[in-house]
């Protein structure tokens, strides 16, 4: 769990998402309004996210779950009621953005990850006034929920660099790069710039 003090929960969550190996993610919040607001904020930060709540039609909820299954989105922001019945094997993380009102809801939430024999991770944000609920959850699950440190900005930066290198390696393996070579040569000739500068751009 992370002590939700100081930096915002949104910043804490995005840093965790960027520093860890994540696949599909379900983020649990308490209100329908927050599902929409948080999904929009995650989208603005470059994540593929969609809300799912009780105000949405059954058809739209099912389509959102299908998008998560088929890798069209990576994050679903959900209320407890709307998340019932979600069974997606690729969910690697459940993030309890808002602590649940009762221990049973917590057990249902974390049961959404680690499906089909895969490893799963659950992260819980706990404000100081919510420590009693944390203790109740530990008692009900008979597990100690350990505190976590947020990834440093340096760790996030290193992770981004590694991901960028991996995307370059993938492009080198799969693509016909001759079109880009021709384009760089054209830019060098037309703009009279150094080849390495054109390639870096």
Stretch-by-stretch model annotation:
Residues 1-43, 182-186:
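Conserved interdomain hinge at the start of the Helicase C-terminal
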Residues 32, 57, 83, 152-153:
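Positions that flank functional sites
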Residues 118-201:
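Arginine-glycine-biased low-complexity disordered regions
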Residues 40-143:
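Conserved RecA-like helicase motor core of SF1/SF2 enzymes
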Residues 29, 54, 80, 106, ...:
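Proline- and acidic/polar-enriched loop/turn elements at helix boundaries
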Residues 9, 34, 102, 130-133, ...:
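Short phosphate-engaging motifs
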């Amino acid at each position: 769990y992370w002590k939700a003090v100081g930096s915002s929960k949104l910043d804490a969550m995005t840093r965790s998402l960027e520093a860890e190996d994540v696949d599909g993610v379900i983020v649990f919040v308490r209100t329908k309004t927050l599902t929409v607001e948080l999904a929009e904020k995650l989208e603005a930060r470059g994540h593929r996210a969609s809300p799912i709540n009780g105000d949405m039609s059954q058809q739209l909820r099912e389509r959102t779950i299908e998008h998560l299954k088929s890798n069209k989105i990576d994050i679903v922001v959900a209320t407890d009621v709307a998340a019932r019945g979600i069974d997606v094997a690729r969910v690697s993380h459940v993030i309890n953005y808002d602590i649940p009102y009762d221990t049973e809801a917590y057990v249902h939430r974390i049961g959404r990850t680690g499906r089909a024999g895969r490893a799963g991770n659950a992260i819980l944000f706990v404000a100081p006034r919510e420590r009693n609920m944390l203790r109740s959850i530990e008692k009900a699950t008979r597990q100690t929920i350990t505190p976590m440190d947020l990834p440093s900005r340096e760790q996030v930066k290193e992770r981004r660099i590694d991901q960028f290198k991996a995307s370059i390696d993938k492009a080198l393996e799969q693509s016909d790069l001759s079109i880009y070579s021709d384009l760089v040569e054209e830019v060098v000739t037309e703009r009279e710039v150094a080849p390495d500068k054109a390639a870096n751009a």
